[in-house]
From Swiss-Prot:
It is a multi-pass membrane protein. Interacts with CACNA1C. Identified in a complex with the L-type calcium channel subunits CACNA1C, CACNA2D1 and either CACNB1 or CACNB2. Acts as an auxiliary subunit for AMPA-selective glutamate receptors (AMPARs). Interacts with GRIA1. Glycans are attached at N42, N45. Its main location: membrane. Keywords: Calcium, Calcium channel, Calcium transport, Cell membrane, Glycoprotein, Ion channel, Ion transport, Membrane, Phosphoprotein, Transmembrane, Transmembrane helix, Transport, Voltage-gated channel. This is Voltage-dependent calcium channel gamma-4 subunit. The modification Phosphoserine is found at S259. One of its GO terms (molecular function) is calcium channel regulator activity. It comes from Mus musculus. It comes from the Eukaryota. InterPro entries: CACNG_subunit, PMP22/EMP/MP20/Claudin, VDCC_g4su, VDCC_gsu. The gene is Cacng4. Belongs to the PMP-22/EMP/MP20 family. CACNG subfamily. Residues 246-256 have a biased composition (Low complexity). It is found in: Cell membrane.
């Protein structure tokens, strides 16, 4: 379900990117931003002797774009003229806000910048569909579309503000009452709405992909940690139970493995005397012939014979016990 929603969002983002760029390109390339009445279409029909046209005379209908004005009525019907944003008969203060506004209006920098950003954003959307694992491309596309929308709305605001000082030859009484916005203007406004929507969708896709990537990484980490040998170690209680059982088994083993021969031998001769007798033979190996004493040798042999006789008696008794013990 999530992949289906993401695929639908990606499809809407792609279609919206194409629509926003197309609308803005059509808007800046056509001359139907404004319908107004102007005297430019019949102004050349007058001579210097006739004087200026009547003050109350209404101008002919024109439609204009960002760079041209075209006549719908009058002598020059169907002809278009380049808009002169700085007429020679007007004296402008170069530090005034009106002069700066006319410069921005003449350059149309914001609509052009918006179109360029929309193009770059559309390319990023296409690259994001090809390289789906790179989320930064989709994020870059979202940022570009948001910036394009902001540039577009700034250009529209500047265009609306400059209508009071429209560069056509409208008279003062005609400036407020005889103009309407055309479909090119509305295409530009619609492009702003679509661009912002596409930007939000692109950022949302980036956030969802990033969340899914983090969840997948966390799940793989937990899976790897559960399969490690440290995760299979027994618990403290299990280790304690095993240690208790092993201690019990070690305590019970001597009683089962004890032999009567060993008990007889250890009970007959203390361990201290046995070690003493054993160590007493070592000096005989290192002594010289001059230190040989017959008395010491006779005592040693007597104790050695007693030890052998006692060992034989203990072994004989143990063998009798084994024979007489019923199975």
């Amino acid at each position: 379900m999530v992949r289906c929603d993401r695929g639908l969002q990606m499809l809407l983002t792609t279609a919206g990117a194409f629509a926003a760029f197309s609308l803005m390109a059509i808007a800046i390339g056509t001359d139907y931003w404004l319908y107004s009445s102007a005297h430019i279409c019949n102004g050349t029909n007058l001579t210097m002797d006739d004087g200026p046209p009547p003050r109350r005379a209404r101008g002919d209908l024109t439609h204009s774009g960002l760079w041209r004005v075209c006549c719908i009525e009058g002598i020059y019907r169907g002809h278009c003229f380049r808009i002169n944003h700085f007429p020679e008969d007007n004296d402008y203060d170069h530090d005034s806000s009106e002069y700066l506004l006319r410069i921005v209006r003449a350059s149309s920098v914001f609509p052009i910048l918006s179109t360029i950003l929309l193009l770059l954003g559309g390319l990023c959307i296409g690259a994001g569909r090809i390289y789906s694992r790179k989320n930064n491309i989709v994020l870059s596309a979202g940022i570009l579309f948001v910036a394009a929308g902001l540039s577009n709305i700034i250009g529209i605001i500047v265009y609306i503000s400059s209508n009071t000082g429209d560069p056509s030859d409208k008279r003062d009484e005609d400036k407020k009452n005889h103009y309407n916005y055309g479909w090119s203007f509305y295409f530009g406004a619609l492009s702003f709405i679509v661009a912002e929507t596409v930007g939000v969708l692109a950022v949302n896709i980036y956030i969802e992909k990033n969340k899914e990537l983090r969840f997948k990484t966390k799940r793989e980490f937990l899976k790897a940690s559960s399969s490690s040998p440290y995760a299979r170690m027994p618990s403290y209680r299990y280790r304690r139970r095993r240690s208790r059982s092993s201690s019990r088994s070690t305590e019970a083993s001597p009683s089962r493995d004890a032999s009567p021969v060993g008990l007889k031998i250890t009970g007959a001769i203390p361990m201290g005397e046995l070690s003493m007798y054993t160590l007493s033979r070592e000096p005989l190996k290192v002594t010289t012939a001059a230190s040989y004493s017959p008395d010491q040798d006779a005592g040693f042999l007597q104790m050695h014979d007693f030890f052998q006789q006692d060992l034989k008696e203990g072994f004989h008794v143990s063998m009798l016990n084994r024979r007489t013990t019923p199975v």
